[in-house]
Swiss-Prot record:
Catalyses which reaction(s): 2 Fe(II)-[cytochrome] + nitrate + 2 H(+) = 2 Fe(III)-[cytochrome] + nitrite + H2O
Enzyme Commission code: 1.9.6.1
Keyword annotations from UniProtKB, A to Z: 4Fe-4S, Electron transport, Iron, Iron-sulfur, Metal-binding, Molybdenum, Nitrate assimilation, Oxidoreductase, Periplasm, Signal, Transport
One Pfam family from the record: Molybdop_Fe4S4
Domain 4Fe-4S Mo/W bis-MGD-type: 39-95
Annotated S-S bridges: none
GO BP: cellular respiration; Mo-molybdopterin cofactor biosynthetic process; nitrate assimilation
Name of the molecule in the record: Periplasmic nitrate reductase
Record note on quaternary structure: Component of the periplasmic nitrate reductase NapAB complex composed of NapA and NapB.
Cofactor, free-text remark: Binds 1 [4Fe-4S] cluster. Binds 1 molybdenum-bis(molybdopterin guanine dinucleotide) (Mo-bis-MGD) cofactor per subunit.
Binding of substrate, residues: F794
Highest classification ranks of the organism: Bacteria, Pseudomonadati, Pseudomonadota, Gammaproteobacteria, Enterobacterales
Annotated gene: napA
Length: 828
């Protein structure tokens, strides 16, 4: 599309706004103005975090050459963060993979062989043999897949169908297990439905923002720019930031709180106690819309059953709860006094009181934001439940400017991992594999025999590592993720299984990541606008984009790989006779015919695409594959509070927030006048629960799985930095971003460094009970840990910080705690 005068003016306004917000607009975006006639522009959501910013992608001669913030995108309003402006360069790293690579020796596959180029047919030949052998000898539980919150919606849906229906294996899990699983379980326990009830529009209407374990200044910078604008434009607006170390978000904080790791649970219960003691409960809301329950305690740490902590737990993995009275709940939180909380957390009393007053003040509209500080936590589900308690006690929920809001880290952790249901226990639209009715709904819609989908929950991310190591999981396909770098406890629990001769590991990726180089077969993958896609962001906004360029060489999309590989299997090879007898018409058919080339999926002709519109998969297959998969998937949520709009609407819009009913999106769920599922006169209805009421849980403080001691005397917290995203497999290939932050460092308090005879710039060995890495001492800069804690980002493949981390998880969500383990330092 051409740049109109209006668009040109908007682009200049964007540049001015970006400068005012401290956001960089690099030359690649500025230089496009003089080239408009030669560049074709189209919309897309950003490839990086879960904010879901809209961008305009400029293509020229088959390449992405420019990118700018989309002034018509309601999320970012024309702004991009530094990563977003460099999107054109993420696809053009010098080491981009362009053909399949198999470990070979003497002309055939060998686990210890060298990576050798092969054809796609050869790659699928080897995969077919490995899958069929495992299925025949050990059954569906011997194969698995690790997917991604970066999959497009239809890629995740196709993968889930292939494994849960085709291969009859629930051993499929996304990397969102490592970042959003605690949020999912927290939502389900409290509300009976997943995902936030509010939206980003809350920012411009809130009186107070409370960040719990969220460095939004670096991890969600566009949303942070909106919060900054709200705070600096209104003197009565307050910002509170809670963390175990000081970071850039503290620069805006009116109340910056540093607490002892794990003690956020104490603070949350203290605030609930403060609300009750100060008669700040919204009695009308509370009496009509809330139930009280006491949760099981001493639930363990998600470690192997043989671990001493698991043996000592009284209720390992228990999600049980029982009703309780208000008086009992009042007595429960009464134990969390101001004095006790200050002592356990290390937070001054006046700061705790100021924080509690924000929630207790009936005239303050409060938003609570959190990300990995809450979720990557051995009691992450509890932390989610406890922050909901504060909003339910005060009625500050499901209304403009008020509410709890779990922010996501990946572009489609919501839209794909959660909504599609690519977790080992989930199906589309909040359905689960353990529910016979839910399985039946899916089997009927997919026209497969009753009983095809297993009722047993599959292996979650950490359990997959353990099963590979134990030789129980033998064929493993990972897509769109770099778990050898990103997952916990690399040395003890992941690398042994990947390099075990009993196992065959496939990695689909655009680049030779740490994971790819540890695999047996690497499949080159198309990325971002090299394929047609859809993401769902943190505010329930589903966004589409068109394919705008073609992938290099033989690189193919994850969707193409899944669909084409399904052709290699006939139903007789994957389903037992008792299933085939129920639908004999499926005998002799391939999984491609049963799952993808069905009348339901293939009914949309390629002619619906514009004549010059790229869509490699659909043009090869002869039908509009993405539309067919999306419309089939969307059926599950329509009429059930997860309504998605018709496929074509999304290509016209800058995203729509579900539920979309009668063409209208929903900004605030569960409240009358905002949510189409709440009838007139109901006020609020949390319709995920049978009685329409949300749940307040009584849950105590319980300690971390590992804490500093005399030998390992420091806490280690891991995370990200502004310039890089996750493991850096894309951002480190952008020269400007790499130069801005070329290698990971160890952020440490100056006094802790001095006590160990360390100075800024020194090399230091960081050692845990599981491994060691060499890093660089940093006593200044953006992150300032308190004494007793160090912080390391995980983007650097040369410093695999996850050699150090413990594979302890929240026992309910199975999400790893990357924020708390014990280390010691040795000068190099």
């Amino acid at each position: 599309m051409k740049l109109s005068r209006r668009s040109f003016m908007k682009a200049n306004a964007v540049a001015a706004a970006a400068a005012a917000a401290g956001l960089s607009v690099p030359g690649v975006a500025r230089a496009v103005v003089g080239q408009q006639e030669a560049i074709k522009w189209d919309k897309a959501p950003c490839r990086f975090c879960g904010t879901g910013c809209g961008v305009l992608v400029g293509t020229q001669q088959g390449r992405v050459v420019a990118c700018q913030g989309d002034p018509d995108a309601p999320v970012n309003r024309g702004l991009n963060c530094i990563k977003g402006y460099f999107l054109p360069k993420i696809m053009y790293g010098k080491d981009r993979l362009t053909q399949p690579l198999l470990r070979m020796k003497n002309g055939k596959y060998d686990k210890e062989g060298e990576f050798t180029p092969i054809t796609w047919d050869q790659a699928f030949d080897v995969m077919e043999e490995k899958f069929k052998t495992a299925l025949k000898e050990k059954g569906p539980e011997s194969i698995g897949m690790f997917g991604s919150g970066q999959w497009t919606i239809w890629e995740g849906y196709a993968a889930s169908k292939l494994f849960k229906a085709g291969f009859r294996s629930n051993n499929i899990d996304p990397n969102a297990r490592h970042c959003m699983a605690s949020a999912v379980v927290g939502f389900m326990r409290t509300f009976g439905m997943d995902e936030p009830m509010g939206c980003y529009d809350d920012i411009e209407q809130a009186d107070a923002f409370v960040l719990w374990g969220a460095n939004m200044a670096e991890m969600h910078p566009i949303l942070w720019s909106r919060i900054t604008n709200r705070r600096l434009s209104n003197q009565d607006v307050t910002v509170a930031v809670l963390s175990t170390y000081q970071h850039r978000s503290f620069e805006l904080a009116d109340n910056g709180i540093i607490f002892t790791p794990q003690s956020d649970l104490v603070i949350l219960n203290y605030i609930a106690n403060y609300i009750i003691q100060n008669n700040a409960i919204n009695q009308d809301f509370f009496s009509k819309h809330v139930n009280l329950r006491k949760g099981a305690t001493d639930i363990g740490y998600g470690l192997r059953p043989t671990h001493p902590l698991e043996k000592a737990a009284k209720n390992p993995g228990s999600d049980a709860s029982e009703p309780m009275s208000f008086e009992d709940y009042k007595a429960f939180v009464a134990e969390y006094t101001l004095e006790k909380t200050a002592e356990m957390t290390g937070v001054p009393k006046d700061q705790l009181e100021q924080l509690a007053q924000l929630y207790a003040d009936p005239n303050k509209k409060v938003i609570s934001y959190w990300t990995m500080g809450f979720n990557q936590h051995t009691r992450g589900v509890w932390a989610n439940n406890l922050v909901y308690n504060l909003h339910l006690l005060t009625g500050k929920i499901s209304q403009p400017g008020c509410g709890p809001f779990s922010l996501t880290g990946q572009p489609s952790a919501c839209g794909t991992a959660r909504e599609v249901g690519t977790f080992a226990h989930r199906l589309p639209a909040d359905m689960v594999v353990t529910n016979e009715k839910h399985r039946d709904i899916c089997e009927k819609k997919w026209n497969i025999p009753s009983g095809t989908i297993p009722a047993k929950i599959g292996l979650h991310a950490v359990a997959q590592d353990r099963a590979l190591k134990d030789g129980k999981l033998n064929v493993y396909w990972t897509m769109c993720t770099n778990n050898m770098q990103a997952g916990p406890n690399i040395n003890e629990e992941r690398m042994p299984g990947w390099r075990d001769p009993r196992n065959f590991i496939i990695v689909s990726d655009p680049y030779p990541t740490v994971s790819a180089l540890a695999a047996d077969l690497i499949l080159p993958t198309a990325m971002w606008v090299e394929k047609e896609g859809a993401y769902g962001n943190a505010e329930r906004r589903t966004q589409f984009w068109r394919q705008q360029v073609q992938a290099p060489g033989e690189a193919k999309s994850d969707l193409w790989q899944l669909v084409q590989f399904s052709r290699r299997f006939k139903t007789e090879e994957v389903w037992p006779e008792e299933l085939l007898a129920k639908k004999p018409e499926l005998r002799g058919k391939t999984l491609y015919e049963v799952l993808y080339a069905t009348p339901e999926v293939s009914k949309f002709p390629v002619s619906e695409l514009a004549e010059d519109q790229l869509n490699d998969e659909s043009r090869e297959l002869g039908f509009y594959l993405q539309k067919g998969l999306f419309e089939e998937y969307a059926w599950f949520g329509r009429g059930h509070g997860h309504d998605l709009a018709p496929f074509d609407d999304y290509h016209k819009a800058r995203g729509l927030r579900w539920p979309v009913v009668n063409g209208k999106e929903t900004q605030w769920r569960y409240s009358e006048g905002n949510d189409p599922y709440v009838k007139a006169g109901e006020g609020y209805k949390f319709y995920g629960k049978p009685d329409g009421k949300a749940v307040i849980f009584a849950l105590p403080f319980e300690p971390a799985a590992e804490a500093p001691d005399e030998e390992y005397d420091l806490w280690l917290s891991t995370g990200r930095v502004l310039e890089h995203w996750h493991t850096g497999s894309m951002t480190r290939r952008v020269p400007e971003l790499h130069r801005a932050f070329p290698e990971a460092v160890l952020f440490i308090h100056p006094l802790d460094a001095k006590a160990r005879d360390l100075r800024r710039g020194d090399k230091v060995k960081v050692v845990s009970r599981r491994g060691e890495v060499i890093s660089i001492v940093e006593t200044r800069g953006r992150n300032r840990p308190p004494q007793g804690l160090v912080y390391m980002p995980f983007f650097d493949a040369a410093q695999l910080v996850n050699k150090l981390t413990l594979d302890a998880t929240d026992p309910l969500s199975k999400e790893t705690d990357f924020k708390k383990c014990a280390v010691k330092l040795e000068k190099v």
